[in-house]
UniProtKB/Swiss-Prot annotation:
[3Fe-4S] cluster binds at residues 44, 50. One of its GO terms (molecular function) is metal ion binding. Ferredoxins are iron-sulfur proteins that transfer electrons in a wide variety of metabolic reactions. Residues 1-35 are annotated as: N-terminal extension. The lineage of its organism: Archaea, Thermoproteota, Thermoprotei, Sulfolobales, Sulfolobaceae. Its cofactor is [3Fe-4S] cluster; [4Fe-4S] cluster. Residues 34-53 form the 4Fe-4S ferredoxin-type domain. Disulfide bonds: none annotated. The modification N6-methyllysine is found at residue 29. This is Ferredoxin B. Binds 1 [3Fe-4S] cluster. Binds 1 [4Fe-4S] cluster. It comes from Sulfuracidifex metallicus.
């Protein structure tokens, strides 16, 4: 699942007010998006395990 301490990773980009943490190298590495709810687009397979609220 998502790293519960993802907010300690560096903010590498901000897209429409949403912070992106970790590695952001599209199209292969998309990082973890969000602050209140985090979505790891590198782990997400639509089963909900990529969301940390």
């Amino acid at each position: 699942g998502i790293d519960p301490n993802y907010r300690s990773l560096p903010v590498v980009k901000e897209e429409q007010g949403v912070k992106i943490y970790g590695t952001y190298e599209p199209p292969t590495k998309l990082g973890i998006w969000g602050t209140i709810v985090g979505v790891d687009f590198d782990l997400c397979i639509a089963d909900g395990s990529c969301i940390n609220a």
